[in-house]
Amino acid sequence: PLFREFSTDDWSNLNWWELVNNAQVMNLAALPRDYQAPIQPIDTWHVSRKLGMMIEANVLNGKLLMTTMDISSHLDRRLVARQMRKALIDYMESDSFQPALTLPVTVISDLFTKTAPPVNMYTKDSPDELKPKLK
């Protein structure tokens, strides 16, 4: 239902470039292990952090849908962002918007205030699939 009005595959395609290029992600390590964000970017093959560009949850007495994508600036020139914004608003106004996850407000505020631990992406090693098979 979330992507009913936004043409997409089950993976990122050209439609997503405008939305994800230079966009920030949220570190969702504090969320339940089995929660999958509706928009979940892939980290590198070195590190597999739990990241999201959108979450939906019940918080306090309401429902929350939060995204890090820019769906508000220059919509007259950004057709993809304009369509994603419309799709999200229509979804939130529909009966289909029923978040399965309930979070305390502190988890949401921590997304804005806590600094994620640094990740060192530098390596001198090769990916496992490129290493020689030693016996």
Question: Each predicted region: which residue ranges?
Answer:
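Catalytic beta-strand/loop cores that center a nucleophilic Ser/Cys/Thr
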Residues: 1-79, 97-135
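Short amphipathic C-terminal alpha-helix that caps PH/PH-like domains
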Residues: 80-93
